[in-house]
Amino acid sequence: ASACSDSFLQTDSPNQPSQTTYWQTESDALMALTACYDAMQSQNLYDDNIDGWKFGFLGRETSTDNGDHTWGNWMLGSSISQCTSATTDECFSMYWNANYEVIKRCNMLVENVERIPMEQEKIEAYKAEAIALRALMYCNLTSVFRDVPYLTKPLTLSEAQAPKTERSQIISSLLEDLKI
């Protein structure tokens, strides 16, 4: 006989949400959507702070024909505008990760919001908003990197190395998604 029963150990922490304890109420849906917007506050996405270390709007603009400036070589934007940046520059991975963080959160909402017992109209509204935010992130990614992994659902560990999808196919999918 065993000293412990099968239910002795809790697998879900009572102190934080999990896939089995979340997605119960409309408040959960609202918090999940808020988390999507919250991730968009990353200084690596839309930061207009001219501190020279981020690749927000300012950094992206320096990679266009408007990017000529004389800020000095210490600023991240200077290497981009002078075409001396390397693919290993940290700004690119930070920008990539920030976009995919928003995408991950949006995909979680789209995949799980239907588990919540609420009106279908509200479910569709939450999904549509998350899909629109996800589309914005893919516009960011494809404008900088062109072909990128196109993820429309949460990834499992075995799917973590997703292949790239052609930019044209991503844009077509986004346009179709936004017809909802």
Q: What positions do the PLM features span?
A:
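Membrane-proximal, proline-rich intrinsically disordered regions
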Residues: 4-56
